[in-house]
Amino acid sequence: MDNNIQRLIDSAKQSLNSPESYKYIDESFESCIKCTACTAVCPVSRNNPLYPGPKQSGPDGERLRLKSAELYDEALKYCTNCKRCEVACPSDVKIGDLIVRARNNHLAQSKKPLMNKLRDAILSNTDVMGKINTPLAPIVNTITGLKATKFMLEKTLNISKKRTLPKYAFGTFRSWYMKNALQDQQKFERKVAYFHGCYVNYNNPQLGKEFLKVFNAMNIGVMLLEKEKCCGLPLMVNGFPNRARNIAQFNTDYIGKMVDENGIDVISEASSCSLNLRDEYHHILGIDNAKVRPHIHMVTPFLYQLFKEGKTLPLKPLKLRVAYHTACHVDKAGWAPYTLEVLKKIPSLEIIMLPSQCCGIAGTYGFKSENYEISQSIGKNLFDNINEGGFDYVISECQTCKWQIDMSSNVTCIHPLTLLCMSMDA
Protein backbone atom coordinates (compact mmCIF):
# COMPACT_ATOMS: atom_id res chain seq x y z
CA MET A 1 0.00 0.00 0.00
CA ASP A 2 2.81 2.41 0.96
CA ASN A 3 4.53 1.77 -2.36
CA ASN A 4 1.33 2.57 -4.26
CA ILE A 5 0.88 5.84 -2.35
CA GLN A 6 4.48 6.84 -2.97
CA ARG A 7 4.08 6.04 -6.67
CA LEU A 8 1.04 8.34 -6.84
CA ILE A 9 3.00 11.13 -5.12
CA ASP A 10 5.97 10.72 -7.48
CA SER A 11 3.66 10.70 -10.49
CA ALA A 12 1.94 13.89 -9.31
CA LYS A 13 5.28 15.63 -8.74
CA GLN A 14 6.45 14.64 -12.22
CA SER A 15 3.27 16.08 -13.76
CA LEU A 16 3.59 19.32 -11.81
CA ASN A 17 7.20 19.75 -12.94
CA SER A 18 6.30 19.27 -16.60
CA PRO A 19 4.95 22.42 -18.33
CA GLU A 20 3.77 20.26 -21.21
CA SER A 21 1.30 18.51 -18.94
CA TYR A 22 -0.83 21.60 -18.50
CA LYS A 23 -1.70 21.68 -22.19
CA TYR A 24 -3.49 18.37 -22.20
CA ILE A 25 -5.17 18.08 -18.79
CA ASP A 26 -8.84 17.28 -19.31
CA GLU A 27 -10.76 17.01 -16.07
CA SER A 28 -14.18 16.76 -17.70
CA PHE A 29 -14.31 13.08 -16.65
CA GLU A 30 -14.96 14.27 -13.09
CA SER A 31 -18.40 15.43 -14.26
CA CYS A 32 -19.47 11.91 -15.30
CA ILE A 33 -22.64 10.93 -13.40
CA LYS A 34 -22.48 7.28 -14.55
CA CYS A 35 -25.84 7.46 -16.33
CA THR A 36 -24.50 5.29 -19.23
CA ALA A 37 -26.29 7.42 -21.83
CA CYS A 38 -23.03 7.30 -23.80
CA THR A 39 -22.98 3.50 -23.84
CA ALA A 40 -26.63 3.40 -24.93
CA VAL A 41 -25.85 5.34 -28.13
CA CYS A 42 -22.43 3.83 -28.86
CA PRO A 43 -22.53 2.02 -32.23
CA VAL A 44 -19.52 -0.13 -31.35
CA SER A 45 -20.93 -1.38 -28.03
CA ARG A 46 -23.99 -2.69 -29.84
CA ASN A 47 -21.93 -4.63 -32.35
CA ASN A 48 -18.70 -5.65 -30.63
CA PRO A 49 -18.84 -7.55 -27.31
CA LEU A 50 -15.09 -6.96 -26.85
CA TYR A 51 -15.64 -3.22 -26.41
CA PRO A 52 -16.72 -2.29 -22.86
CA GLY A 53 -18.23 0.99 -24.00
CA PRO A 54 -17.36 4.68 -23.80
CA LYS A 55 -18.11 5.10 -20.08
CA GLN A 56 -15.66 2.40 -19.06
CA SER A 57 -13.04 3.29 -21.67
CA GLY A 58 -13.48 7.03 -21.13
CA PRO A 59 -14.20 8.60 -17.72
CA ASP A 60 -14.06 5.37 -15.67
CA GLY A 61 -10.84 4.33 -17.35
CA GLU A 62 -9.32 7.80 -16.98
CA ARG A 63 -9.60 7.64 -13.20
CA LEU A 64 -7.66 4.37 -13.23
CA ARG A 65 -5.13 5.61 -15.77
CA LEU A 66 -4.28 8.60 -13.58
CA LYS A 67 -3.30 6.15 -10.85
CA SER A 68 -1.22 3.88 -13.04
CA ALA A 69 -0.04 4.13 -16.62
CA GLU A 70 -0.17 0.34 -16.74
CA LEU A 71 -3.97 0.43 -16.81
CA TYR A 72 -4.28 1.28 -20.49
CA ASP A 73 -6.50 -1.18 -22.27
CA GLU A 74 -6.34 -2.92 -25.64
CA ALA A 75 -10.10 -2.33 -25.98
CA LEU A 76 -9.42 1.37 -26.62
CA LYS A 77 -8.64 0.47 -30.23
CA TYR A 78 -12.27 -0.44 -30.90
CA CYS A 79 -13.53 3.15 -30.45
CA THR A 80 -14.39 4.76 -33.81
CA ASN A 81 -14.14 8.36 -32.52
CA CYS A 82 -17.67 9.00 -33.80
CA LYS A 83 -18.33 11.24 -30.75
CA ARG A 84 -21.96 10.19 -30.44
CA CYS A 85 -21.14 9.57 -26.78
CA GLU A 86 -20.28 13.25 -26.39
CA VAL A 87 -23.54 14.30 -28.04
CA ALA A 88 -25.51 12.10 -25.60
CA CYS A 89 -23.61 13.06 -22.44
CA PRO A 90 -25.72 15.35 -20.20
CA SER A 91 -22.58 16.49 -18.34
CA ASP A 92 -20.56 17.51 -21.42
CA VAL A 93 -17.78 15.05 -20.70
CA LYS A 94 -15.33 14.91 -23.62
CA ILE A 95 -15.49 11.13 -23.74
CA GLY A 96 -14.18 10.66 -27.26
CA ASP A 97 -11.25 12.99 -26.62
CA LEU A 98 -10.35 11.10 -23.44
CA ILE A 99 -10.32 7.82 -25.35
CA VAL A 100 -8.24 9.14 -28.28
CA ARG A 101 -5.58 10.55 -25.95
CA ALA A 102 -5.54 7.36 -23.86
CA ARG A 103 -5.26 5.21 -26.99
CA ASN A 104 -2.31 7.24 -28.25
CA ASN A 105 -0.58 6.90 -24.89
CA HIS A 106 -1.28 3.17 -24.87
CA LEU A 107 0.10 2.71 -28.38
CA ALA A 108 3.20 4.67 -27.41
CA GLN A 109 3.84 2.20 -24.58
CA SER A 110 2.92 -1.00 -26.42
CA LYS A 111 4.55 -2.82 -29.29
CA LYS A 112 2.17 -2.70 -32.22
CA PRO A 113 2.86 -5.46 -34.80
CA LEU A 114 5.20 -4.11 -37.47
CA MET A 115 2.83 -4.69 -40.40
CA ASN A 116 -0.06 -3.06 -38.54
CA LYS A 117 2.15 -0.08 -37.76
CA LEU A 118 3.11 0.16 -41.45
CA ARG A 119 -0.56 -0.21 -42.43
CA ASP A 120 -1.62 2.56 -40.07
CA ALA A 121 1.17 4.82 -41.34
CA ILE A 122 0.10 4.27 -44.95
CA LEU A 123 -3.57 4.96 -44.17
CA SER A 124 -2.72 8.02 -42.07
CA ASN A 125 -0.19 9.82 -44.26
CA THR A 126 -2.67 10.93 -46.90
CA ASP A 127 -0.49 13.68 -48.36
CA VAL A 128 2.41 11.30 -48.95
CA MET A 129 0.18 8.70 -50.60
CA GLY A 130 -1.64 11.35 -52.62
CA LYS A 131 1.55 12.86 -54.01
CA ILE A 132 2.81 9.42 -55.01
CA ASN A 133 -0.44 8.16 -56.55
CA THR A 134 -2.07 11.11 -58.35
CA PRO A 135 0.54 11.29 -61.15
CA LEU A 136 0.01 7.56 -61.70
CA ALA A 137 -3.73 7.53 -60.99
CA PRO A 138 -4.93 5.47 -64.00
CA ILE A 139 -2.39 2.74 -63.25
CA VAL A 140 -2.83 2.85 -59.46
CA ASN A 141 -6.63 2.75 -59.68
CA THR A 142 -6.51 -0.27 -61.98
CA ILE A 143 -4.06 -2.15 -59.78
CA THR A 144 -5.86 -1.45 -56.48
CA GLY A 145 -9.13 -2.61 -58.03
CA LEU A 146 -7.77 -6.09 -58.77
CA LYS A 147 -8.82 -8.98 -56.54
CA ALA A 148 -5.21 -10.17 -56.42
CA THR A 149 -4.07 -6.79 -55.10
CA LYS A 150 -6.76 -6.76 -52.43
CA PHE A 151 -5.83 -10.30 -51.42
CA MET A 152 -2.17 -9.29 -51.04
CA LEU A 153 -3.06 -6.14 -49.09
CA GLU A 154 -5.04 -8.22 -46.62
CA LYS A 155 -2.33 -10.85 -46.22
CA THR A 156 0.48 -8.32 -45.79
CA LEU A 157 -0.98 -5.11 -44.33
CA ASN A 158 -4.29 -6.33 -42.88
CA ILE A 159 -6.32 -4.01 -45.12
CA SER A 160 -9.61 -5.78 -45.75
CA LYS A 161 -9.92 -7.36 -49.19
CA LYS A 162 -13.66 -6.69 -49.03
CA ARG A 163 -13.18 -2.92 -48.84
CA THR A 164 -13.47 -0.88 -52.02
CA LEU A 165 -10.41 1.36 -52.08
CA PRO A 166 -10.76 5.08 -52.94
CA LYS A 167 -9.82 6.14 -56.45
CA TYR A 168 -7.21 8.83 -57.07
CA ALA A 169 -7.67 11.72 -59.48
CA PHE A 170 -5.17 12.23 -62.29
CA GLY A 171 -3.79 15.55 -61.07
CA THR A 172 -4.52 17.55 -57.93
CA PHE A 173 -7.14 20.20 -57.26
CA ARG A 174 -4.46 22.62 -56.12
CA SER A 175 -2.56 22.39 -59.41
CA TRP A 176 -5.82 22.87 -61.35
CA TYR A 177 -6.67 25.95 -59.26
CA MET A 178 -3.27 27.56 -59.80
CA LYS A 179 -3.43 27.03 -63.57
CA ASN A 180 -7.10 27.70 -64.25
CA ALA A 181 -8.80 29.62 -61.44
CA LEU A 182 -6.34 31.78 -59.50
CA GLN A 183 -6.48 34.80 -61.79
CA ASP A 184 -10.28 34.78 -62.12
CA GLN A 185 -10.73 34.80 -58.34
CA GLN A 186 -8.91 38.12 -57.98
CA LYS A 187 -11.75 40.06 -59.62
CA PHE A 188 -14.14 39.45 -56.71
CA GLU A 189 -14.22 42.16 -54.06
CA ARG A 190 -15.29 39.80 -51.28
CA LYS A 191 -13.32 36.60 -50.75
CA VAL A 192 -13.11 33.50 -48.58
CA ALA A 193 -10.21 31.09 -48.12
CA TYR A 194 -10.73 27.43 -48.92
CA PHE A 195 -9.11 24.63 -46.91
CA HIS A 196 -9.54 21.93 -49.53
CA GLY A 197 -8.02 19.04 -47.60
CA CYS A 198 -6.60 15.81 -48.97
CA TYR A 199 -9.83 14.27 -50.33
CA VAL A 200 -10.57 17.13 -52.73
CA ASN A 201 -6.91 17.56 -53.60
CA TYR A 202 -6.13 13.94 -54.45
CA ASN A 203 -9.43 12.07 -54.86
CA ASN A 204 -12.18 14.44 -55.97
CA PRO A 205 -11.01 17.77 -57.46
CA GLN A 206 -14.48 18.15 -58.99
CA LEU A 207 -15.91 18.86 -55.54
CA GLY A 208 -13.41 21.68 -55.14
CA LYS A 209 -14.50 23.11 -58.48
CA GLU A 210 -18.09 22.97 -57.27
CA PHE A 211 -17.05 24.87 -54.14
CA LEU A 212 -15.71 27.65 -56.37
CA LYS A 213 -18.81 27.59 -58.57
CA VAL A 214 -21.18 28.07 -55.63
CA PHE A 215 -19.23 30.90 -54.02
CA ASN A 216 -18.54 32.64 -57.33
CA ALA A 217 -22.27 32.54 -58.07
CA MET A 218 -22.71 34.51 -54.83
CA ASN A 219 -20.12 37.01 -56.09
CA ILE A 220 -17.49 35.77 -53.64
CA GLY A 221 -13.97 34.84 -54.72
CA VAL A 222 -12.08 31.85 -53.37
CA MET A 223 -8.46 31.93 -52.26
CA LEU A 224 -6.30 29.02 -51.15
CA LEU A 225 -4.01 29.03 -48.15
CA GLU A 226 -0.39 29.64 -49.11
CA LYS A 227 0.30 26.12 -47.84
CA GLU A 228 -1.75 23.41 -46.17
CA LYS A 229 -1.45 19.78 -45.16
CA CYS A 230 -3.99 17.05 -44.40
CA CYS A 231 -5.88 18.13 -41.27
CA GLY A 232 -4.08 15.34 -39.39
CA LEU A 233 -7.13 13.50 -38.09
CA PRO A 234 -6.02 10.06 -39.44
CA LEU A 235 -2.66 10.46 -37.71
CA MET A 236 -4.30 11.60 -34.49
CA VAL A 237 -6.55 8.53 -34.17
CA ASN A 238 -3.99 5.97 -35.36
CA GLY A 239 -1.32 6.52 -32.75
CA PHE A 240 0.82 9.25 -34.32
CA PRO A 241 -0.01 12.24 -32.06
CA ASN A 242 3.35 13.98 -32.39
CA ARG A 243 3.15 13.96 -36.17
CA ALA A 244 -0.47 15.13 -35.95
CA ARG A 245 0.54 17.93 -33.57
CA ASN A 246 3.22 19.17 -35.97
CA ILE A 247 0.73 19.23 -38.83
CA ALA A 248 -1.87 20.96 -36.66
CA GLN A 249 0.59 23.71 -35.79
CA PHE A 250 1.56 24.05 -39.47
CA ASN A 251 -2.05 24.45 -40.60
CA THR A 252 -2.91 26.77 -37.71
CA ASP A 253 0.04 29.01 -38.60
CA TYR A 254 -1.00 29.29 -42.26
CA ILE A 255 -4.65 29.84 -41.38
CA GLY A 256 -3.48 32.57 -39.01
CA LYS A 257 -1.40 34.11 -41.76
CA MET A 258 -4.42 34.19 -44.09
CA VAL A 259 -6.59 35.78 -41.39
CA ASP A 260 -3.93 38.36 -40.46
CA GLU A 261 -3.05 39.38 -44.01
CA ASN A 262 -6.47 39.24 -45.64
CA GLY A 263 -9.00 39.33 -42.81
CA ILE A 264 -11.15 36.60 -44.37
CA ASP A 265 -12.75 33.40 -43.13
CA VAL A 266 -11.43 29.91 -43.88
CA ILE A 267 -14.02 27.41 -45.12
CA SER A 268 -13.88 23.63 -45.45
CA GLU A 269 -16.45 21.47 -47.23
CA ALA A 270 -15.44 18.42 -45.14
CA SER A 271 -17.17 17.91 -41.80
CA SER A 272 -14.35 16.03 -40.05
CA CYS A 273 -11.68 18.45 -41.31
CA SER A 274 -13.76 21.39 -40.09
CA LEU A 275 -14.26 19.87 -36.65
CA ASN A 276 -10.60 18.93 -36.38
CA LEU A 277 -9.27 22.34 -37.44
CA ARG A 278 -11.67 24.21 -35.19
CA ASP A 279 -11.99 22.04 -32.07
CA GLU A 280 -9.76 18.96 -31.92
CA TYR A 281 -6.50 20.81 -32.55
CA HIS A 282 -6.98 22.37 -29.13
CA HIS A 283 -8.99 19.72 -27.27
CA ILE A 284 -6.83 16.72 -28.19
CA LEU A 285 -3.51 18.05 -29.48
CA GLY A 286 -3.15 21.08 -27.22
CA ILE A 287 -2.67 23.57 -30.06
CA ASP A 288 -3.46 27.19 -29.21
CA ASN A 289 -5.82 28.11 -32.04
CA ALA A 290 -7.94 30.63 -30.13
CA LYS A 291 -7.07 33.44 -32.56
CA VAL A 292 -8.13 31.57 -35.70
CA ARG A 293 -10.94 29.42 -34.32
CA PRO A 294 -13.71 32.03 -34.92
CA HIS A 295 -12.63 32.23 -38.57
CA ILE A 296 -12.89 28.48 -39.33
CA HIS A 297 -16.22 27.35 -40.75
CA MET A 298 -17.96 24.34 -42.22
CA VAL A 299 -19.37 25.25 -45.63
CA THR A 300 -23.10 24.69 -45.12
CA PRO A 301 -23.49 26.80 -41.95
CA PHE A 302 -21.49 29.50 -43.72
CA LEU A 303 -23.77 29.32 -46.77
CA TYR A 304 -26.78 29.48 -44.46
CA GLN A 305 -25.42 32.72 -43.02
CA LEU A 306 -24.85 34.11 -46.51
CA PHE A 307 -28.48 33.38 -47.38
CA LYS A 308 -29.50 35.17 -44.19
CA GLU A 309 -27.46 38.18 -45.36
CA GLY A 310 -29.48 38.26 -48.57
CA LYS A 311 -27.11 36.38 -50.89
CA THR A 312 -28.80 34.13 -53.45
CA LEU A 313 -28.01 31.33 -55.89
CA PRO A 314 -29.63 30.80 -59.32
CA LEU A 315 -31.26 27.54 -58.24
CA LYS A 316 -33.68 25.76 -60.57
CA PRO A 317 -36.19 23.00 -59.74
CA LEU A 318 -34.86 19.51 -59.12
CA LYS A 319 -37.56 16.86 -59.01
CA LEU A 320 -35.52 14.45 -56.93
CA ARG A 321 -36.09 12.47 -53.76
CA VAL A 322 -32.93 12.57 -51.66
CA ALA A 323 -31.96 11.19 -48.26
CA TYR A 324 -29.88 13.25 -45.87
CA HIS A 325 -27.41 11.25 -43.77
CA THR A 326 -26.19 13.03 -40.63
CA ALA A 327 -22.51 12.15 -40.40
CA CYS A 328 -21.23 11.59 -36.87
CA HIS A 329 -19.06 14.71 -36.72
CA VAL A 330 -21.87 16.78 -38.24
CA ASP A 331 -24.07 15.55 -35.41
CA LYS A 332 -21.38 16.40 -32.86
CA ALA A 333 -20.98 19.95 -34.20
CA GLY A 334 -24.71 20.57 -34.70
CA TRP A 335 -24.40 21.43 -38.39
CA ALA A 336 -27.22 19.26 -39.81
CA PRO A 337 -30.02 21.88 -39.47
CA TYR A 338 -27.97 24.38 -41.47
CA THR A 339 -27.37 21.90 -44.28
CA LEU A 340 -31.06 21.05 -44.45
CA GLU A 341 -32.04 24.73 -44.59
CA VAL A 342 -29.57 25.33 -47.42
CA LEU A 343 -30.91 22.35 -49.40
CA LYS A 344 -34.48 23.57 -48.89
CA LYS A 345 -33.58 26.50 -51.15
CA ILE A 346 -33.67 24.07 -54.11
CA PRO A 347 -37.19 24.14 -55.64
CA SER A 348 -39.11 20.85 -56.01
CA LEU A 349 -36.52 18.88 -54.02
CA GLU A 350 -37.88 16.25 -51.63
CA ILE A 351 -35.56 15.77 -48.66
CA ILE A 352 -35.92 12.86 -46.23
CA MET A 353 -33.77 13.01 -43.10
CA LEU A 354 -32.57 9.52 -42.24
CA PRO A 355 -32.40 8.42 -38.59
CA SER A 356 -29.10 9.68 -37.22
CA GLN A 357 -26.74 6.71 -37.04
CA CYS A 358 -23.11 5.92 -37.77
CA CYS A 359 -22.29 4.45 -41.19
CA GLY A 360 -19.51 2.41 -39.58
CA ILE A 361 -16.45 3.32 -41.63
CA ALA A 362 -15.06 5.94 -39.21
CA GLY A 363 -12.28 7.10 -41.53
CA THR A 364 -9.45 4.56 -41.62
CA TYR A 365 -11.18 2.30 -39.05
CA GLY A 366 -13.30 0.40 -41.57
CA PHE A 367 -10.36 -0.31 -43.89
CA LYS A 368 -8.65 -2.54 -41.33
CA SER A 369 -9.29 -6.28 -41.60
CA GLU A 370 -9.93 -6.66 -37.88
CA ASN A 371 -12.62 -3.95 -38.01
CA TYR A 372 -14.33 -4.61 -41.34
CA GLU A 373 -17.17 -6.86 -40.14
CA ILE A 374 -17.89 -4.59 -37.17
CA SER A 375 -17.88 -1.60 -39.52
CA GLN A 376 -20.45 -3.18 -41.81
CA SER A 377 -22.57 -4.37 -38.90
CA ILE A 378 -22.69 -0.85 -37.47
CA GLY A 379 -23.92 0.55 -40.78
CA LYS A 380 -26.40 -2.20 -41.70
CA ASN A 381 -29.56 -0.41 -40.54
CA LEU A 382 -28.50 2.72 -42.39
CA PHE A 383 -27.86 0.79 -45.60
CA ASP A 384 -31.25 -0.93 -45.32
CA ASN A 385 -33.00 2.43 -44.85
CA ILE A 386 -31.25 3.80 -47.91
CA ASN A 387 -31.96 0.78 -50.11
CA GLU A 388 -35.63 0.66 -49.14
CA GLY A 389 -36.33 4.40 -49.39
CA GLY A 390 -36.58 4.88 -53.15
CA PHE A 391 -34.01 7.68 -53.14
CA ASP A 392 -32.25 9.21 -56.12
CA TYR A 393 -29.25 10.26 -54.02
CA VAL A 394 -27.94 10.26 -50.47
CA ILE A 395 -26.53 13.57 -49.25
CA SER A 396 -23.65 13.80 -46.78
CA GLU A 397 -20.88 16.28 -45.98
CA CYS A 398 -18.49 13.47 -45.00
CA GLN A 399 -16.26 11.93 -47.65
CA THR A 400 -15.62 8.65 -45.86
CA CYS A 401 -19.37 8.28 -45.30
CA LYS A 402 -19.65 8.65 -49.07
CA TRP A 403 -17.17 5.81 -49.62
CA GLN A 404 -19.05 3.57 -47.20
CA ILE A 405 -22.52 4.36 -48.56
CA ASP A 406 -21.42 4.04 -52.19
CA MET A 407 -19.91 0.63 -51.46
CA SER A 408 -22.59 -0.72 -49.14
CA SER A 409 -25.85 0.54 -50.65
CA ASN A 410 -27.51 0.81 -54.05
CA VAL A 411 -27.62 4.62 -54.00
CA THR A 412 -24.86 7.12 -54.80
CA CYS A 413 -23.86 9.54 -52.04
CA ILE A 414 -23.04 13.14 -53.01
CA HIS A 415 -22.05 16.33 -51.20
CA PRO A 416 -24.56 19.18 -50.66
CA LEU A 417 -22.39 21.38 -52.90
CA THR A 418 -22.81 18.88 -55.72
CA LEU A 419 -26.58 19.02 -55.36
CA LEU A 420 -26.54 22.83 -55.39
CA CYS A 421 -24.51 22.77 -58.62
CA MET A 422 -26.93 20.25 -60.14
CA SER A 423 -29.75 22.69 -59.39
CA MET A 424 -27.81 25.61 -60.86
CA ASP A 425 -27.18 23.62 -64.06
CA ALA A 426 -30.71 22.20 -64.37
From Swiss-Prot:
Pathway entry: Polyol metabolism; glycerol degradation via glycerol kinase pathway; glycerone phosphate from sn-glycerol 3-phosphate (anaerobic route): step 1/1
Positions of [4Fe-4S] cluster 2 binding:
42, 79, 82, 85
- Annotated membrane topology: Peripheral membrane protein
Which organism does this sequence originate in? Haemophilus influenzae (strain ATCC 51907 / DSM 11121 / KW20 / Rd)
Q: What's a Gene Ontology MF term here?
A: glycerol-3-phosphate dehydrogenase (quinone) activity
Lineage, top-rank taxon, reads: Bacteria
Record's subcellular location? Cell inner membrane
GO BP annotations of the record are: anaerobic respiration; electron transport chain; glycerol catabolic process
Briefly, what is this protein's role? Electron transfer protein; may also function as the membrane anchor for the GlpAB dimer.
Q: Name one Pfam family in it.
A: CCG
Which protein are we looking at? Anaerobic glycerol-3-phosphate dehydrogenase subunit C
Q: Is this entry keyworded Electron transport?
A: yes
